[in-house]
Regions:
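NAD(P)H-binding glycine-rich loop region in Rossmannoid oxidoreductase-like domains
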Residues: 59-97
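Conserved Rossmann-fold NAD(P)-dependent oxidoreductase catalytic core, especially the SDR/UDP-sugar
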Residues: 103-147
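Rossmann-fold cofactor-recognition segment
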Residues: 48-62
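Conserved beta-loop-beta element that borders a ligand/cofactor-binding pocket
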Residues: 157-182
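Conserved cofactor-binding/catalytic machinery of classical short-chain dehydrogenase/reductase
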Residues: 61, 75, 101-104, 141, ...
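SDR active-site strand-loop-helix element
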Residues: 6, 37, 76-80, 120-126, ...
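Active-site helix of classical SDR
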Residues: 148, 152
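N-terminal Rossmann NAD(P)H-binding glycine-rich loop of SDR-like oxidoreductase domains
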Residues: 1-26
């Protein structure tokens, strides 16, 4: 199985790559190749039982996502994001990475066609809910983002759902509560 991690140089991406390298399997299938991508070249995990390729580019630039999915990865972890504070401070950059990059990735997968239907794991955020919200958030709770970042992630979730509904890929979204930008 070929795995692609977009955002592999970030904290979550590094931890994920290390865990996959340690396990060597995902969902009962052996990992044979990993492509690790970020805006800066990520490190390949040590002692991986599979081949790792590391790439650096801005995935929101035209044509970059097509290059990333050309190898037809079976599972794509889309972890790349401009976090909330920076997305608020630099409106254009937030939308370019968090929304345009996501849209280009999904469109590049769709453009391959020919029965290609990877599993997409999209990381979202509780920022899609705004505030205040209850301690336990049920499926019926509406998304009402109060920030540009929350809006970008909410739109990403809707796109993920629609592309999955149309059968272009098998998508799953994970809403992360809070991510520390730097470990420690």
């Amino acid at each position: 199985m070929h795995i692609l991690i977009i955002g592999a140089a970030g904290m979550v991406g590094r931890k994920l790559a290390e865990r996959l390298a340690k396990d060597g399997h995902l969902g009962g299938r052996e990992i044979t190749k990993a492509t690790l991508h970020d805006v800066v070249e990520p490190s390949a995990p040590a002692d991986a039982k599979f081949t790792s390729t590391t790439l650096a580019s801005d995935f929101s630039m035209p044509g970059e996502t097509a290059k990333l999915v050309a190898g037809r990865p079976d599972v794509i972890f889309h972890l790349a994001a401009i976090v909330s504070g920076e997305a608020e401070q630099d409106f254009d950059k937030g939308y370019r990475i968090n929304l345009d990059g996501t849209m280009q990735l999904f469109a590049a997968i769709r453009a391959i066609g020919d029965g290609y239907k990877p599993r997409i794991v999209f990381t979202s955020s509780i920022a899609v809910f705004g505030a205040p919200f209850p301690e336990a958030i049920g499926d019926e709770f509406f998304t009402t983002p109060l920030t540009s970042y929350g809006t970008q992630k909410a739109i990403g979730e809707l796109l993920l759902s629609d592309y999955s509904r149309k059968g272009f890929f098998d998508g799953i979204g994970i809403r992360l509560p809070t991510i520390c930008v730097r470990p420690g």
